[in-house]
Amino acid sequence: MTKTKIMGILNVTPDSFSDGGKFNNVESAVTRVKAMMDEGADIIDVGGVSTRPGHEMITVEEELNRVLPVVEAIVGFDVKISVDTFRSEVAEACLKLGVDIINDQWAGLYDHRMFQVVAKYDAEIVLMHNGNGNRDEPVVEEMLTSLLAQAHQAKIAGIPSNKIWLDPGIGFAKTRNEEAEVMARLDELVATEYPVLLATSRKRFTKEMMGYDTTPVERDEVTAATTAYGIMKGVRAVRVHNVELNAKLAKGIDFLKENENARHNFS
């Protein structure tokens, strides 16, 4: 049975929108990682820079100071480690320690050394769709054009196709209607044959799905609904805060999809 990968979020920042300040020392971060592993995480995604609206950009040195001690403490654990960074200097420092994946919210567009660095260490990379929100074509077409162009550049740099993930970038440079359009057409991203990572957890999109104001934690059940929907559309991994809820849900949806496929094959 094909298993949907669960990427657990570990923000080692003081200002992330959902859990800023909760895990920004090594001891609390390690405790959280162990808990997420017990809950079913296949990947831990460590992030040292907040992506909330209006966040303050920090220096490379500050990002390294936040991320490296945590990575050093967890890199030997029996779980894949991803680092959420768009800076090749941070990526390389973490890859030297044995990190498996670089999760680049700018898909190599911010730092043109990123692909060479990831290829050098034979690692995986997540390419997320981003931008300034100004586009000359419909959002899905622009997303596909941009991500496929960057995936091509990643392959030229030496990263094999099976180590390139695509993320549609829910919550980044899109209107509410554009995010809804991207979700409805996830299967078109899946059809590229690159593995797709869906990252909606606790974002504005999930609040708007509920139709009323909520705290980030109160959006977990709706996040799980997007997980189920994404899996049915063919995504291979989901990036979430609430690992236990989404891992259980994904296991159930994976079973049902496998059962459906088996019945179709039998008939």
Swiss-Prot record:
It comes from the Bacteria. Its EC number is 2.5.1.15. It catalyses: (7,8-dihydropterin-6-yl)methyl diphosphate + 4-aminobenzoate = 7,8-dihydropteroate + diphosphate. Pathway: Cofactor biosynthesis; tetrahydrofolate biosynthesis; 7,8-dihydrofolate from 2-amino-4-hydroxy-6-hydroxymethyl-7,8-dihydropteridine diphosphate and 4-aminobenzoate: step 1/2. The keyword Zinc-finger does not apply. Residues 1-251 form the Pterin-binding domain. Its cofactor is Mg(2+). (7,8-dihydropterin-6-yl)methyl diphosphate binds at residues 52, 84, 103, 167, 203, 239-241. The keyword Metal-binding applies. Magnesium is required for activity, even if it seems to interact primarily with the substrate. One of its GO terms (molecular function) is metal ion binding. It is an enzyme of class 2 (transferase). SUPFAM superfamilies: Dihydropteroate synthetase-like (SSF51717). One of its GO terms (biological process) is response to antibiotic. Signal peptide: none annotated. Keywords: Antibiotic resistance, Folate biosynthesis, Magnesium, Metal-binding, Transferase. Mg(2+) binds at residue 11. GO terms for cellular component: cytosol. Belongs to the DHPS family. Homodimer. Specific mutations in this gene are a major cause of sulfonamide resistance in MRSA clinical isolates. Catalyzes the condensation of para-aminobenzoate (pABA) with 6-hydroxymethyl-7,8-dihydropterin diphosphate (DHPt-PP) to form 7,8-dihydropteroate, the immediate precursor of folate derivatives. This is Dihydropteroate synthase. It comes from Staphylococcus aureus. The lineage of its organism: Bacteria, Bacillati, Bacillota, Bacilli, Bacillales.
